[in-house]
Swiss-Prot record:
This is Cell division protein ZapD. The lineage of its organism: Bacteria, Pseudomonadati, Pseudomonadota, Betaproteobacteria, Burkholderiales. Pfam families: ZapD. It comes from Burkholderia multivorans (strain ATCC 17616 / 249). The keyword Cell cycle applies. GO terms for cellular component: cell division site; cytoplasm. It is found in: Cytoplasm.
Amino acid sequence: MILYEYPFNERIRTLLRLEDLFERFAFFLAQEDPREHHVALTTLFEIAEVTGRADLKSDLMKELERQRQTLAPFRGNPGIEQNALEAVLGEIEQTLANLAQMQGKTGQHLVDNEWLASIRSRAVIPGGTCKFDLPSYYAWQQWPAEQRRQDIAKWIMPLLPLRDAATIVLRLARESGQASKVMAMQGSYQQMLSGRSYQLMQVRVPRELHVIPEASANKYMLWVRFTMQDGDVRPRAVDIDVPFQLTLCNL
């Protein structure tokens, strides 16, 4: 099954983008080649761009505190696995403490680093980080991989509490949903939501069908339409019945 996820609001959309960026960052940071570390560094700049939103930190803290208050009353409940509950609450409380310790504007340490700022300004120009443009950056790229890795890890460190918070919120959202098997008749599916509020929709489709879901929703109804990509042409709507799994997630 291939999993597709669709956010229902801007906050979840931002967290999904952050998750994708941090996963890409971790992958390229673990590599050895300077060109791969260049991708890790430019991804760090993208992360700083997304996390630089003034209200992101406060939004995450409010959501984590809300989840803590929701889960804490279940302590001592015999119907709840207490070890798992304590692990989640401990993770939330530690992440809240780490967020509270973040001082100043998010990502300001990258702005204040003149050398990184010069790389960042050139990185948005196609081919702008050639060795003749940034000889000091080229020299740094010749350092041992582990030394480069340590530098990049140091630069990402102040942003990690936001990664941890986003991870918790997305995990709790995903775990809140229950998958149901449904059928898109002639490639199209609709479902009434009756005014219920959801944050995230997951669509799982059989890999062998080679179909691509396109989704939209409002507070009353959701639509899923399946298309198929064939060569260089735009995806076209399919007219076959498509079985898939639908999960609606609500924090």
